Swiss-Prot record:
Annotated family: Belongs to the CIMAP family.
Organism this protein belongs to: Bos taurus (Bovine)
Disulphide bonds in the chain: none
Start-end of Polar residues biased regions: 191-201
Higher taxonomy: Eukaryota, Metazoa, Chordata, Craniata, Vertebrata
Protein name in the entry: Protein CIMAP1C
Cellular component GO terms, alphabetical: cytoskeleton
Superkingdom of origin organism: Eukaryota
Length: 201
């Protein structure tokens, strides 16, 4: 490669020759690195209300932020803080997870209060479930009066016996059937030859 005439030093494209600075072995140049976490930001007065990231009253303008967040609830922040840089969401009640709802959103309490009443609960109609009268008990049978749903319904005895004879159900077992003997009433039933066990009612 031939150099142009008049050029004594072969330095290309604006390169400057390196200056050799003599460095002694005892003197080394030490530079302290800049820790960004130690730098202070503009301060908490930048925004109207301090953030709740990391811990309560955390300075959001600091460069270093903690790795966790305490969810402190500021109910007045969403109403008063109109200059906050964070997003503010106003949810439309008609939007559901399936899209825009076409029907009006009515609370369930209003649905229940507007339900039509059954015909037997209207005024002037007879009540189906009537309370059974209290029966006097002997001192040996004294117990607290327990009213069940079966006792509150007054069924005619004829209808109950007709159902038991039609279904082949035997009357309530006596003490002899509980002890292992078959009652005479059960032998008269057409279902007496079945292998069903006798249950006490």
């Amino acid at each position: 490669m031939k150099l142009p005439k008049g050029v004594k030093n072969p330095v290309f494209y604006g390169q400057q020759p390196e200056k050799k600075v003599p460095m002694s072995s005892g003197h080394e140049i030490k530079q302290t690195p800049v820790v960004l976490a130690m730098l202070k930001g503009p301060g908490p007065a930048k925004y109207l209300r301090p953030s709740c990231t990391g811990y309560i009253d955390h300075d959001v303008s600091m460069f270093q932020e903690p790795a966790y967040t305490l969810h402190a609830w500021h109910p007045e922040k969403r109403i008063m803080d109109i200059r906050s840089p964070g997003p503010c969401y106003f949810l439309d009640p008609k939007i559901t997870r399936f899209g825009m709802a076409s029907c009006p959103q009515v609370p369930m309490a209003e649905h229940i209060s507007n339900l039509p009443w059954p015909p037997w609960t209207r005024t002037g109609s007879t009540r189906i479930c009537q309370e059974a009268p209290d029966r006097p008990h002997t001192p040996g049978q004294s117990r607290p009066s327990i009213r069940t749903a079966a006792l509150s319904i007054a069924w005619p005895n004829a209808l109950a016996t007709r159902w038991t004879t039609h279904l082949g159900l035997a009357p309530a077992p006596t003490m002899s059937s509980r002890s292992g003997h078959t009652s005479p009433a059960r032998l008269l039933s057409p279902w007496a030859s079945s292998t069903r066990p006798t249950y006490a009612r």
